[in-house]
């Protein structure tokens, strides 16, 4: 039914719509939990192409430096090393929730790393998921 009452659209709605969480229940708990504590609710971080390219370049350099392979091929590091670095960087960053870190590391462990337990840059850049 149509009414004369004006609907107020919150100014943060466009940012909220960008979030598109993979786990709606987890996201809703985090979102409404943050609102109840007077904190800024989670929104999807927008990374521009040049910034993303720099991140991939940095990841490649880290993998090359830490690689246990020195005979050509793509640089690879043990998953345990990647897990330690990712967890440490996420903690230092302070904007990545521990639940996100756990989900991401679990996904990589189950779906990305090979039977040798090594992870490489191509696993991120060429993985269709």
Swiss-Prot record:
This is Ropporin-1. 'Ropporin' comes from the Japanese word 'oppo' which means 'tail'. Its main location: other. Sumoylated, sumoylation decreases upon spermatozoa capacitation conditions. Important for male fertility. With ROPN1L, involved in fibrous sheath integrity and sperm motility, plays a role in PKA-dependent signaling processes required for spermatozoa capacitation. It comes from Mesocricetus auratus (Golden hamster). Belongs to the ropporin family. PANTHER family: ROPPORIN-1-LIKE PROTEIN (PTHR14952), ROPPORIN-1B (PTHR14952:SF12). The RIIa domain mediates interaction with AKAP3. GO terms for biological process: cilium organization; flagellated sperm motility; protein localization to cilium; regulation of protein phosphorylation; sperm capacitation. Residues 11-34 form the RIIa domain. GO terms for cellular component: cytoplasm; motile cilium. The keyword Membrane does not apply. Homodimer. Interacts with AKAP3. May interact with SPA17. Interacts with RHPN1. Interacts with FSCB; the interaction increases upon spermatozoa capacitation conditions. Interacts with CFAP61. It is found in: Cell projection, Cilium, Flagellum. Coiled coil: none annotated.
């Amino acid at each position: 039914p149509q009414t004369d009452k004006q609907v107020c659209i919150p100014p943060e709605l466009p940012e909220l719509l960008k979030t598109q969480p993979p786990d709606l229940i987890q996201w809703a708990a985090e979102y409404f939990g943050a609102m109840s504590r007077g904190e800024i609710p989670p929104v999807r971080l927008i990374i521009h192409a040049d910034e993303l390219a720099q991140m991939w370049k940095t990841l490649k350099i880290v993998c090359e430096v830490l690689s246990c392979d020195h005979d050509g091929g793509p640089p690879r590091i043990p998953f345990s090393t990647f897990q330690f670095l990712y967890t440490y960087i996420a903690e230092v960053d302070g904007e990545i929730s521990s639940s996100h870190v756990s989900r991401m590391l679990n996904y990589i462990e189950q779906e990305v790393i090979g039977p040798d337990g090594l992870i490489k840059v191509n696993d991120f850049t060429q993985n269709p998921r």
